Regions:
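Short beta-strand edge/turn micro-motifs at domain boundaries
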Residues: 108-134
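Beta-strand residues in well-ordered beta-sheet regions across diverse protein folds
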Residues: 94-95, 127
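A solvent-exposed, acidic/Ser-Thr-rich amphipathic alpha-helical stretch
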Residues: 30-84, 90
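Short, low-complexity N-terminal intrinsically disordered segments enriched in polar/charged residues
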Residues: 1-35, 39
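Hydrophobic/aromatic beta-strand elements that line small-molecule binding cavities or substrate pockets
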Residues: 79-85, 97-100, 112-118
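Hydrophobic alpha-helical core bundles mediating ligand binding, dimerization, or RNAP-core interactions
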Residues: 18-21, 25, 37, 41, ...
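Short, cysteine-centered beta-strand-loop-beta hairpins and adjacent loop/turn segments enriched
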Residues: 100-108
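Detector for glycine-centered tight turns/loop "hinges" at secondary-structure junctions
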Residues: 47-49, 105, 122
Length: 134
């Protein structure tokens, strides 16, 4: 386990990135969302490892995301857990849970995930997400 001081420093680095990621996601603002990522960017979900370059995340990509979320009645998501489990000066592992909500405030689903943030090109960004969401 990392020391309390290391975890506190990692939280100062990671939480603003995760907050910005969720804000961009909820707005379906592709540019804001991408600004929180490092590329290539990876997502492991439903047994499939997805790999995206910056150029892969375009209007067609966000349209697919919007359609998929609309199909489940999604309106917004919130973080319900963010715990630093491992950290260094170049990488942070964050055990997360997020909850998806409908417009009326009812829960669509809650999913556990692991987010890996890396320090590249002078900034922290999300490099990998491993999620139990579909």
């Amino acid at each position: 386990m990392p020391s309390e001081e290391a975890v506190a420093q990692a939280r100062e680095r990671a939480i603003p990135v995760l907050d910005a990621w969720m804000t961009g996601f909820n707005a379906l603002d592709l540019q804001a969302w991408k600004a929180t990522m490092h590329f290539p960017h990876f997502r492991l979900a439903s047994g499939i490892m997805h790999r995206w370059e910056d150029a892969d995340m375009d209007d067609t990509f966000i349209a697919r995301v919007r359609t998929g979320l609309g199909n489940i009645g999604w309106h917004y998501s919130v973080w319900t857990r963010r715990e630093i489990v491992h950290c260094s000066d170049e990488k942070i592992h964050v055990d997360t849970q997020f909850t998806r909500y409908r417009e009326d405030g009812s829960v669509v689903a809650a999913h556990d995930s692991l987010y890996v943030l890396t320090y590249e090109d002078g900034r922290w960004g999300i490099k990998l997400r491993s999620s139990f969401a579909r």
